[in-house]
Amino acid sequence: MNFTLLATEGFGLNFNLFETNILNWAVVIFGLYKFLPSFLGKMLQKRREGILLELKDAEDRLLNATQALEKAKKDLSSAEEKASQIKADSLKRSESIRMESEKKAIEEMARIKQSAISDESSEASRAISQLRKEAIELAIKKALDSLPNRLDQTKQENLVTQSINNIEEN
């Protein structure tokens, strides 16, 4: 390299304070050092307080959510217990209703059977009564048909007299 070129071009330090802006930089740095901490400190303090407040609020919400979750779990277990109790009760009730229905059906079938037997015996009794009535009517008709041939005048008078005497005695 060419060192003579460097020496002639003026490479070096400039100690003129006004040309180098060292005073300007010193004022700016001093101002920043003096005023920035209070201004920035207030902003940072407000931001810190805001963050702490938000953290406390988040912790409170977490606590409330945890408590609500615990309550919901208790309510759920209580509801499940109640549902299983209701299910067991309904099964018992349906079983008793089924048994009662079966009992009523059996009783109704027995009543219908008894009624049928009763109807059958009353029908038989009615048929027997009808047959007796027809037999009596037929016997009376036969007797009346054969009576004029078998009775003469004196026998008829004796029969009438005897019937009148029987009526008077009673």
From Swiss-Prot:
Key words of the record: ATP synthesis, CF(0), Hydrogen ion transport, Ion transport, Membrane, Thylakoid, Transmembrane, Transmembrane helix, Transport
Transmembrane stretches, start-end: 15-37
InterPro entries reported for this sequence: ATP_synth_b/b'su_bac/chlpt
Membrane topology classification: Single-pass membrane protein
MF-aspect GO terms: proton-transporting ATP synthase activity, rotational mechanism
Location of this chain's protein in the cell: Cellular thylakoid membrane
Origin superkingdom: Bacteria
Cross-referenced CDD domains: ATP-synt_Fo_b
Region (Disordered): 72-98
Any one Gene Ontology cellular component term annotated for this protein: plasma membrane-derived thylakoid membrane
Family to which this protein belongs: Belongs to the ATPase B chain family.
Complex formation: F-type ATPases have 2 components, F(1) - the catalytic core - and F(0) - the membrane proton channel. F(1) has five subunits: alpha(3), beta(3), gamma(1), delta(1), epsilon(1). F(0) has four main subunits: a(1), b(1), b'(1) and c(10-14). The alpha and beta chains form an alternating ring which encloses part of the gamma chain. F(1) is attached to F(0) by a central stalk formed by the gamma and epsilon chains, while a peripheral stalk is formed by the delta, b and b' chains.
Protein's name in the database: ATP synthase subunit b
Taxonomic lineage of the native organism: Bacteria, Bacillati, Cyanobacteriota, Cyanophyceae, Synechococcales
Gene: atpF
